[in-house]
UniProtKB/Swiss-Prot annotation:
Name of the encoding gene: nuoK
Assembly with partners or alone: NDH-1 is composed of 14 different subunits. Subunits NuoA, H, J, K, L, M, N constitute the membrane sector of the complex.
Topological relation to the membrane, as annotated: Multi-pass membrane protein
Catalytic activity: a quinone + NADH + 5 H(+)(in) = a quinol + NAD(+) + 4 H(+)(out)
Protein's name according to its UniProt entry: NADH-quinone oxidoreductase subunit K
Source organism: Chelativorans sp. (strain BNC1)
Cellular compartments per GO CC: NADH dehydrogenase complex; plasma membrane
Amino acid sequence: MEVGIAHYLTVSAVLFTLGIFGIFLNRKNVIIILMSIELILLAVNLNFIAFSAVLGDLVGQVFALFVLTVAAAEAAIGLAILVVFFRNRGSIAVEDINMMKG
């Protein structure tokens, strides 16, 4: 049995769907929302790499590396903001974040 593009697209669709459900079903915990965004970005990267391998073009793989770099920076900055917010407010609930000034 050969692993084709359909298998990669199926796994990518499942990851993307899990990420979307994670965002919509859990609106109270910011950390789970960030992890769901990372799942969505992982699904997009899997699509880029799968199509890059099938088409024989390296542009998709290079773009996936850029997306991974931006996702890592986004996760680091998001978690740093959450740590500072937790130290100031004592909670990371989404309802408390809506009450921020600025």
